[in-house]
Amino acid sequence: MEFKAFIEITRPHNCLLAGIVGVLGSIVAAGGLPELKTAILVFLVVFLGCAGGNTINDYFDYEIDKINRPERPLPRGAMSRKAALWYSVALFATGIVLAWFINIWDFLLAIVAYVTMFIYAWKLKPMPFIGNVVVASLTGATPLYGAIAVGEIGLAGTLALCAFLVNVAREVIKDIEDIEGDMAKGAKTLPILIGRKRAAYVGALFAILTVVASFLPIKAGIGLGYLAMLPVDAVILYSAFLILRSQDRETAHRAQILLKVSVFLAVVAFLIASLVR
């Protein structure tokens, strides 16, 4: 068993990004910096939830990762499945304890989110489109988690909607990327059921809906601060163009990575908008 596997299996860069998005959700909602204690707790609860979710996902995806992700800790033998299971439980438990010190609503939301992550990895992931929507909902809830911590919603509501829509697009495109391994496991993902091309249309549609939703703050009188979102919209539309042009594994990987980056860029754009309006 490799010690570094305990770090690697959590996908720390993803968890770091998620934690930052949670904190930025607080800032976007309040239009200013939250208390340091609140910011640290929000970051840790989101980070630990993401880490636990990635770990339990790898536990249940052991067989399919032998095909799609053979370099990951479990399929390459760097960590046992039993260790991964208990590690995920420890991560979730620590996050729930910390959430108690934020407020009751964030405590309850953390429990719901963590349980949803487990059920998703256990049962929902192979279900066509439903699994995609669940993951996107969890991602969309991340900035809302930070907003609830400061008792405000504000622009974080629109940010959460955009994060949800763009992540539906990303999850569908990821399924296009992983179609070979999913077929080998017998999963019934959207690309397997309706074909790569039609799935690409679905992914592109949600990407376009994200861009449309991103204009909502203008109606709230956000002013010139919205201009920061325009480059993000361009990245999202380019991702849609890529997947419509080609559905091969390499292109799908590139498109979904761009959409992943766009989530963080969108948070930064909304942050700028909330501070300069």
From Swiss-Prot:
Q: Name one Pfam family in it.
A: UbiA
**Which chain regions cross the lipid bilayer?**
16-36, 40-60, 83-105, 107-124, 146-166, 202-222, 224-244, 256-276
Entry's localization field: Cell membrane
UniProt entry tagged with the keyword Transmembrane helix: yes
Q: Which family does it belong to?
A: Belongs to the UbiA prenyltransferase family. DGGGP synthase subfamily.
**Enzyme category, top tier:** transferase
Q: Name one GO molecular function term.
A: magnesium ion binding
Official protein name in the record: Digeranylgeranylglyceryl phosphate synthase
Keywords attached to this Swiss-Prot or TrEMBL record, sorted alphabetically, are: Cell membrane, Lipid biosynthesis, Lipid metabolism, Magnesium, Membrane, Phospholipid biosynthesis, Phospholipid metabolism, Transferase, Transmembrane, Transmembrane helix
Catalyzes what? sn-3-O-(geranylgeranyl)glycerol 1-phosphate + (2E,6E,10E)-geranylgeranyl diphosphate = 2,3-bis-O-(geranylgeranyl)-sn-glycerol 1-phosphate + diphosphate
State the Gene Ontology BP annotations: glycerophospholipid biosynthetic process
